From Swiss-Prot:
UniProt cross-references to InterPro entries, sorted A to Z: NopRA1_C (IPR032436), Npa1_N (IPR021714), URB1 (IPR039844)
Compartment(s) of residence: Nucleus, Nucleolus
Record GO terms (molecular function): mRNA binding
Keyword Nucleus assigned: yes
Organism: Saccharomyces cerevisiae (strain ATCC 204508 / S288c)
GO cellular component, one term: nucleolus
Protein name, entry field: Nucleolar pre-ribosomal-associated protein 1
Function: Required for 60S ribosomal subunit formation and pre-rRNA processing. Required for normal accumulation of 25S and 5.8S rRNAs.
Keyword terms of this UniProt record: Nucleus, Ribosome biogenesis, rRNA processing
Major localization listed first in the record, in broad terms: nucleus
Length: 1764
């Protein structure tokens, strides 16, 4: 009370103050109130002038003072009224732009000086006073669209204890609940505060909103707590809308933020709204949960890299949270969502059911635990209750979920966990006993639903089984099938259920259908276990004896006939029943009826095809002949008037099918006379004479013609059918035969067909097949209809075939367009029907395209059209992705000799070579590499050669030198332009070393003498081959000794001799080459010097000049000057790269005209870069040559400053800075001129404002992006360093911060250097601008991949947002780089006047190369260690009672974000970094001690709470072990003991992870290691010795051998990973060698059951040793015999690999067995790793004379043996 009295005075004093000011203040308030009322009352034109005058006179401040005064004297009425008046005033001031400034001033006055008045009103906790304050705050938020929200958040303390209390409803409100009147709710404190709060977070920026929601958890908790009890439906809807739109759908909020705000409490309260009577609220709640859990873009679901795996396929670990459901343990990443699902009751309403299923679909890892959770609600015994029906629907929908996308994409040798997969197929609630009870339940609906669940489970099992086959998990598939089989009822149960169903209700067809489907799937999935005994009279026999069958009966028969294949008895479907038809005929009836849909017709046709396929009934054709038969019968069914006579047809079919099945070969022999047409047609013709033809047989003739015509269209021999009709069917007139069955004059016959009354005419509208068959050729381009089945597609192919074979159809644009249009229809159809055999027609066209030599008459038109069709078929296969392998195999088999096509296989001698070339060229786009190379070996057009070479190059293929020779020979007399294009392609192969030798005796693969001689003969065939020859000389297999005997063969070729002389300059010591070179350079040097080189030879001027430049020292000064004079006079070549190189080599800038030339050349560069949109290769060459010239010592003094600056402006302000060669040139340009010459400030501004530079630094992510970023930043660094004082501005600093990534990359180090310089000149730290910190955890990496790279620093309106990534910190630990190159000093006092550009360029290039070599994928240790002290979540500022400020380290946060581990790892760094790390460790130790002491004190105070006591004890123990570890580290430093190797520090950082994982197998050992000693010993690598010794100990204990070996492999994996990642220096290598680690690793490789991953780790350890150890680990060669060890290992693996080239056989292996492919690829990968190691050791051996003698020179033989 005393404090209060001192602040506000006594009651009497306050009353006196109030009385004195009452009259004036009341008058002021009344005036304002009248002004506000007047403005609000005006409707059209509002007059704000009185209000403006009121505030201009200073009454605004008095108003606020009066308001404050009323609060002080507790005049509640006046205070409330004044508060409301302020709210109205702000509302009016916000309504017009002329008064917004006044309102802003009023708000700032309130926030800066009168926030205590706001607090006083809120603390009163009475609706009369508090509600107006809340409305005032809401108006402040709304003012001018949220203009003052940030100021409100800054000045107003949202941590006030009163704010959460405002959300606690009164007892009366709780008693009334949601049913209370809206008016009363609007007056409640909770309602008003929620409206203010929702307005605030909706209008706040995302960053402010996040801070409000996360920092004020008590407010959010109280808001959630009473949502379902006190809030009206309308308010609840508003709350949910804000949650959805402003939290869940806020793109800047990460999932961790969303889960922190919308926690389990929120979900539980919101779920209550499902039971609201307000439908809109129910929909809104459902929308919330859909967004919360099912939305792929906005949900809180964290990505799961396990799904059906127990551990991550990436690293073998499980990162999920452990949960236990009904005594079953799971590791899940979405515990919040799982607990949310437990709230749902999907059996109560479909809305919850649909939402739950969508969440499970989005988060498939929850399916298994949720399925187990359902078992906690009770058993599944059948009952006629709503719960049972609801839970059945839920289970069925769970079973029906698709295979997760993650599983579809994953490629792992480790199979999924069967226990998880089975829950996705058959949830545990569906026990065998409950299913049996359901199948035997008396109510049919229960039995049907049980069958439905089993059917869905079997369907899912089939999909998963196929999926397992695709992934190569066949062993696990067997386990899965066995597990499923034990969970479903036995087959006799289903048979019994089927019999009981028929006995109780014969008309019920649904349940028998379900059981039939079960039998069908059962027979497919468990063929060896499938055997049922049906009674003699059953539903299947009953249906087959019926005269008509329905659709559902057909479905029953369909399944029955399929599972009968696996049963002991077979159905005689071909025999007619007594008084009825055969099943074959019955199915034809059903398929051809008017009411049969296309789906039913297709399904029956497929079934009949399956039945007839094993019998000799139809010939093999393009598609199933049954479809053609059904189609003809459909035409017959359209003849309504003749339907009564259909029985004749059905009887005819019965007799036909019965006989052809029983005696098929009789009809095969009969068909011999008719070109072996189908036996069915022959039997049909045999039975024709027995068909009753009384009445009107005309309809039979119509059908017969239609059927035979259909058969011809799908591939039956039309000549044989024509002969058969004439001999057996005399009733068919010759006129009809000619029109419908003959292919001659097909186009004329179509017109007659369309005008006749045949069945074809009547079917055109219903059958696409008949439509396309009767369409005139001229209309084939205008088909709007699409094929819907195989028969339709076959009709299209037949029409195309007729066009191809019709000689009257010429090959023109119309033919190409029509063929493309029709083939496009096939391609669109194959999108849905991938099995359509389009490849079957390929051989026919190949036969047309490649007539055999024996055929004298060649049809060129038919050949050309057929080649085009082969190309179209290849295009269809390529575009659809189906049958491409078969396409290639057919072509290779026909075209080449032999079945197995190797490279350069010979053509089949049955065909003319020219025909084969033309054919292969037409389909070259779709051929395999071997076929293409064979084609290139033969004579083909240069245009095709160029295209094929480009295709091979783009696919990364290699070609043989013999192919190059062949191409050069055949191009000799071709068009020069074509030759040049081909030569450019060949040169690329040489430059990329993609040309291999055919045969070589040289162990290093050099070209032999005979091969070189032969190749030189090919080169001299044309002078235009100089491009290939130039690349040939740089080829890795080029051998100068093999070349020199042939050198004089190129003497007569000017370009070749010039190129040879220039390229082989380094071999001038050779006598023969020296003579050749002197003759060449003398001849052409004299011609240039005398200016006698004619214009006709100007095309080789550049090559001559390049040669002269190379041999410039061989000319005297006079000759050089003569050549220079000639060069300067050549206007066509003045600005060529060759000219620049010569002038640079001549290096005489005092020669008349050279300086002028230099200025003009620079101007030419500027003009070119300013005007051109595309840069040519020749200009890039010019830039490179100019860069070399500018490095010369004399050049800087000759440069014009204005030209240089204008050129820099042209480049730095354009898009050309994205070109690496341009950037390299700019760096040289900057280095070669005086610092004072460049306008650095302007250039820095140009570069930073260039969007292209921003794009380079932020968006670029290609293979050259690293170098491009470095060059562009180096330019900025150089320009900045010219005048750092002037360039050190806040704008430059802010821009650079957005480009900085905080890594040790070369460009980041340069930016950091600039930032340090700016801070030193401005004396302000950029860390003051940090507004917010973000920390991205592992679970959010998937989001980063979706939205792109997340910058370390981003600029927002509020300030800088700094984002650290946990994954990046992990990488920084694993890939910690100790030797980090420092930024070179380019502008120091020592070289201020030294403009040696060459030295600087070399320094820059060396800096980049060294940085890239060391690795850049880690945070800069110094930057990170200094930055973390600014993060309030890591280091908090604490004030004690005396006002002293201390800093507390939040150890748990250090541990969680891996920074503690990073600190330990950085102890191996340089002294500066290590000292900072030790300082952090000291502070961490101090903070831990204080926290432990505080917890002990609290423990004593709250010792009565046993649960808390126990948890506190665990936490104290948890902190204590880290205290011990830190003290050990600090003690080691105090004792000044031997330095600790980096490997040990890295091992300790990994120990930290084990200490925090109590369930880890190595946790106990890690704990013991920490407690084992008081210091860190320089030779003690944690865990290594234990694991090395443990194997022998475990083998002595036979009882626990199997269990312990699994533990051992886990420990071994940890140790190997630690060594592999931790070995960084030569000292690490020596320490491991002393401990015998390498010998132990070699012994491990011999373990038979060592996992592939562990074996790879061992290989990589030796790989790192070769590069880390100073001598490469030579002792391993001499002492451990590692070379011979790996060579034996390599030979062993080679013997297990296929003999063929693996890469060329991947497609075959994938088709045969995915498991075999995986095994083969693993072996190939292991072999590749071993060969790399052997090649590395070979280089080490050759580097030591002692080892060469020791190995007796066998190292080269090792390489030979590898290449065999």
């Amino acid at each position: 009370m005393s404090n209060h009295s001192e602040a506000y005075g006594s009651r009497d004093q306050r009353r006196e103050k109030y009385t004195q000011g009452k009259e004036f203040e009341d008058g002021t308030l009344e005036t304002l109130e009248s002004i506000i009322s007047a403005v609000e009352d005006e409707t059209l034109s509002k007059d704000y002038q009185p209000l403006i005058v009121f505030f201009q006179r200073g009454f605004g401040a008095q108003l606020v003072q009066t308001w404050s005064y009323y609060a002080q004297v507790n005049n509640h009425g006046k205070f409330s009224k004044t508060t409301s008046l302020l709210t109205k005033t702000l509302r009016v001031l916000s309504s017009d732009t002329s008064t917004v400034t006044i309102g802003s001033g009023l708000i700032r006055l309130i926030l800066t000086d009168y926030t205590k008045v706001l607090y006083r009103g809120l603390n009163n906790m009475r609706a009369q006073l508090t509600n107006p304050i809340l409305r005032l705050l809401k108006q402040i938020v709304n003012f001018n669209n949220g203009q003052h929200i940030e100021e409100l958040v800054s000045y107003f303390d949202f941590s006030l204890p009163i704010l959460p209390r405002l959300l606690v409803p009164s007892k009366s409100e709780l008693a009334n609940g949601n049913s209370s009147a809206d008016s009363s709710k609007h007056d409640s404190l909770r309602f008003t505060f929620i409206k203010f709060w929702l307005t605030l977070i909706s209008n706040a920026s995302p960053f402010v909103r996040k801070e409000l929601l996360t920092e004020n958890f008590k407010i959010m908790s109280n808001l959630f707590k009473f949502m379902n009890k006190a809030d009206s439906d309308k308010l609840s809807e508003h709350i949910l809308s804000v949650f959805i739109n402003d939290i869940l759908k806020e793109k800047s909020f990460k999932r961790t933020t969303k889960t922190k705000i919308l926690n389990e409490l929120a979900a539980s309260k919101i779920h209550h709204f499902y039971y609201s009577s307000n439908k809109n609220l129910v929909k809104k709640a459902n929308e919330f949960f859909l967004t919360f859990g099912a939305s792929r873009d906005f949900s809180v679901a964290f990505p799961d890299n396990c799904v059906w795996f127990k551990n991550s396929v990436a690293d073998g670990a499980s990162h999920g949270a452990p949960i236990t459901v009904n005594q079953v343990e799971f590791q899940i990443h979405n515990k919040l969502l799982f607990n949310t699902l437990r709230l749902f009751k999907p059996w109560e309403d479909t809305l919850q059911l649909g939402t739950l299923i969508k969440i499970l679909e989005n988060v498939p890892e929850l399916v298994a635990p949720y399925s187990i959770f359902l078992t906690t609600n009770g058993n599944y015994d059948p009952k006629m209750t709503s719960y049972w029906f609801g839970i059945t629907l839920l289970i069925n929908k769970i079973i029906n979920l698709k295979i997760p996308q993650f599983m579809e994409k994953v490629d792992s040798n480790i199979p999924p966990a069967t226990s998880l997969v089975i829950e996705n197929i058959l949830p545990s609630l569906l026990t065998k006993s409950s299913l049996v009870k359901s199948l035997q339940f008396e109510t049919p609906i229960i039995r049907q639903l049980a069958c439905q669940s089993i059917v869905l489970a079997l369907k899912k099992l089939e999909k998963v089984s196929t999926f397992y086959d695709q992934k190569g998990w066949r062993n696990e598939k067997t386990i899965l099938l066995n597990e499923f089989h034990t969970r479903i009822p036995d087959l006799p149960i289903f048979v019994s259920t089927l019999s009981n169903s028929l006995a109780s209700n014969k008309d019920n067809r649904i349940l028998p259908l379900s059981i039939s489907i079960i039998f069908n799937y059962y027979s497919k999935m468990f063929p060896n276990l499938f055997s049922i005994n049906l009674p003699s009279s059953n539903i299947y026999t009953d249906i087959m004896q019926k005269s008509k069958i329905s659709g559902i009966e057909f479905a029953i028969l369909d399944n029955y006939l399929q599972f009968q294949e696996f049963n002991s008895t077979q159905t005689r479907w071909w025999n007619p029943s007594s008084g009825g038809n055969s099943l074959f005929t019955l199915l034809l009836k059903l398929a051809s009826s008017k009411n049969a849909s296309n789906v039913i017709t297709t399904r029956i046709s497929n079934l009949l095809d399956e039945l007839t396929r094993t019998n000799v009934i139809f010939n093999i054709s393009l598609i199933s002949p049954v479809m053609a038969l059904v189609n003809s019968l459909q035409g017959l069914s359209l003849q309504v008037s003749e339907i009564d006579n259909m029985e004749q047809v059905w009887k005819w079919f019965d007799e036909t099918i019965s006989r052809v099945v029983k005696t098929p070969y009789k009809y095969v022999d009969m068909a011999k006379e008719y070109n072996y047409i189908s036996p069915f047609i022959m039997c049909l013709s045999e039975q024709w004479k027995y068909v009753d033809k009384s009445g009107n047989p005309e309809f039979l003739i119509k059908w017969l013609i239609l059927f035979l015509r259909n058969m011809i269209f799908i591939g039956e021999d039309h000549i044989g059918i024509d002969k058969l009709v004439k001999n057996v069917f005399p009733e068919v007139s010759d006129h009809d035969v000619n029109i419908y069955l003959k292919l001659d004059s097909f186009e004329e016959n179509i017109k007659k067909t369309n005008s006749s009354n045949s069945l074809i005419s009547s079917m055109k509208s219903s059958s696409f097949f008949q439509y396309i068959s009767a369409l005139p050729s001229k209309n084939l381009m205008n088909i709007s209809r699409l094929p819907v089945n195989k028969l339709d597609a076959a009709g299209i192919l037949f029409r195309v075939q007729l066009l191809v074979e019709d000689d009257s159809v010429v090959y023109d644009n119309w033919f190409e367009a029509t063929a493309c249009e029709l083939t496009g229809k096939i391609a669109s159809y194959m999108v849905t029907d991938t099995e359509f055999p389009i490849i079957k027609v390929l051989e026919r066209y190949i036969n047309f395209a490649l007539p055999k030599l024996a055929i004298e008459k060649r049809n060129a038109l038919l050949m050309k059209k057929s080649r085009f069709m082969c190309n179209l078929i290849g295009a269809v296969c390529f575009e659809t992705g189906h049958q491409l392998v078969e396409f290639r195999e057919i072509i290779q088999k026909v075209v080449f000799s032999g079945e197995n096509v190797e490279e350069y296989a010979n053509y089949n001698e049955l065909y003319q070579k020219e025909d084969v070339n033309a054919f292969l060229t037409s389909v070259s786009e779709y051929l395999s590499t071997s076929a293409l190379t064979s084609l290139l070996m033969c004579s083909t057009k240069l245009e095709s050669t160029r295209n094929i070479l480009q295709k091979l190059f783009n696919e990364g293929k290699t070609i043989k030198i013999s192919l190059v020779k062949n191409i050069l020979n055949k191009a000799a007399n071709e068009d020069p332009a074509s030759i040049k294009e081909v030569n450019i392609s060949l040169a690329k192969f040489f430059e990329e070393n993609k040309v291999c030798v055919d045969a070589s005796s040289d162990p290093m693969g050099k070209l032999s003498l005979s091969e070189t001689t032969s190749l030189i003969n090919s080169f001299v065939s044309s002078d235009l081959n100089y491009l290939v020859l130039k690349a040939f000389y740089r080829w890795e297999h080029f051998s100068f000794p093999s070349f020199i005997p042939s050198i004089w063969r190129i003497k007569d070729s000017p370009l070749l001799s010039i190129v040879t002389t220039a390229a082989l300059f380094k071999h001038m010591q050779d006598k023969d080459f020296s003579a050749f070179a002197h003759e060449t350079i003398s001849k052409y040097g004299n011609e240039i010097a005398k200016s006698t080189y004619t214009t006709s030879k100007s095309e080789i001027f550049d090559e001559i000049l390049n040669m002269i430049t190379t041999y410039i020292d061989f000319y005297d000064e006079t000759k050089r000057n003569e050549i220079l004079k000639c060069v300067l006079s050549q206007s066509d070549h003045k600005y060529h790269a060759a000219t620049v190189r010569y002038i640079a080599a001549h290096n005489n800038f005092t020669y008349p005209g050279v300086e002028t030339w230099l200025h003009k050349t620079l101007l030419y560069l500027t003009k070119y870069l300013s005007e051109r949109k595309v840069i040519s290769n020749s200009f890039f060459e010019l830039l490179r040559a100019m860069a070399e010239l500018l490095k010369l010592e004399e050049v800087p003094n000759k440069l014009n400053v204005k030209i240089i600056n204008s050129q820099l402006e042209a480049i730095l302000g354009s898009e050309w800075i994205k070109q690496i060669k341009v950037l390299e040139y700019v760096i040289v340009l900057i280095f070669c001129v005086s610092k004072k010459s460049i306008q650095s400030q302007r250039m820095v501004q140009l570069l930073l404002s260039n969007d292209s530079y921003s794009s380079i630094m932020i968006k670029d992510n290609d293979e050259d992006s690293s170098y491009r970023k470095f060059l562009s930043t180096m330019i900025l660094f150089s320009l900045f360093s010219i005048d750092p004082v002037v360039n050190s501005t806040p704008i430059v600093q802010e821009k650079l911060l957005t480009f900085y990534s905080g890594t040790i990359s070369s460009n980041d180090k340069l930016i950091l250097k600039i930032l340090e310089t700016i801070e030193s000149h401005t004396a302000t730290s950029w860390t003051n601008m940090i507004f917010s910190w973000e920390f991205i955890k592992d679970e959010e990496e998937e989001i980063l991949e979706a939205i792109g790279d997340t910058r370390l620093i981003t600029k927002e309106r509020e300030g800088l947002i700094l984002t650290l990534q946990k994954n990046m910190i992990k990488k920084s630990i694993d890939r910690y780089v100790l030797e980090r190159p420092q930024v070179p000093e380019l502008y120091t006092d020592s070289n201020t006047n030294n403009y040696d550009a060459t030295t600087r360029c070399d320094l820059v290039k060396k800096y980049y190369d060294d940085t890239e070599r060391s690795g850049v994928d880690m945070y800069d240790p110094l930057f990170l260690l200094l930055l973390i002290i600014h993060n309030k979540e890591l280091v908090k500022m604490v004030k004690d009672d005396e006002g002293n400020v201390t800093y507390r380290y939040e150890f748990e946060n250090f541990l969680d974000c891996k920074i503690f581990q990073f600190i330990i790892c950085s102890l191996s760094d340089c002294h500066t970094v290590a000292n900072i790390s030790y300082e952090h460790l000291s502070n961490l130790a101090s903070s831990l001690e204080k926290k432990t002491a505080q917890m002990n004190l609290e423990k004593q105070i709250t010792s009565k709470d046993n649960e808390r006591k126990e948890s506190d004890s665990d936490l104290i123990k948890y902190n204590s072990i880290y205290q011990v570890l830190i003290k050990r580290i600090l003690y080691q430093r105090q004792q000044n003991q031997d330095p600790i190797n980096p490997l040990i520090w890295f091992s300790i950082s990994r120990i930290v992870d084990l200490l925090g994982s109590p369930t880890a197998p190595l946790h106990e050992k890690a704990y013991r290691w920490v407690l084992s000693n008081s210091t860190i010993r320089s030779w003690d690598i944690p865990m290594v010795s234990d694991v090395m010794m443990s194997y022998n100990k475990r083998q002595q204990d036979d009882n626990k051998k199997e269990i312990d070996m699994e533990i051992y492999y886990g420990e071994l994996s940890w140790v190997l990973t630690t060594i592999c990642k931790g070995i960084k220096t030569d000292e690490d290598y020596k320490m491991l060698e002393k401990k015998g680690v390498f010998e132990w690793l070699l012994n491990l490789i011999n373990m038979p059951y060592l996992k592939e991953r562990l074996r790879e780790l061992i290989y990589f350890i030796f790989y790192k040793v070769q590069r880390v150890a100073d001598d490469g680990g030579l002792n391993l060669i001499s002492r451990n015999g590692i070379v011979s060890f790996f060579e034996v290992l390599n030979n062993n693996i080679k013997s297990r690999l296929p003999q063929d080239d693996i890469l060329n056989n991947i497609g075959t292996l994938r088709n045969e067995n995915r498991g075999t492919l995986n095994t083969t690829l693993r072996l190939a990968q292991e072999q590749n790793g071993i060969e790399k190691l052997l090649l590395g050791y070979n280089e080490l051996v050759k580097s030591q004379k002692r080892l060469i003698l020791w190995t007796e020179g066998d190292s080269d033989n090792v390489v030979k043996r590898l290449r065999k």
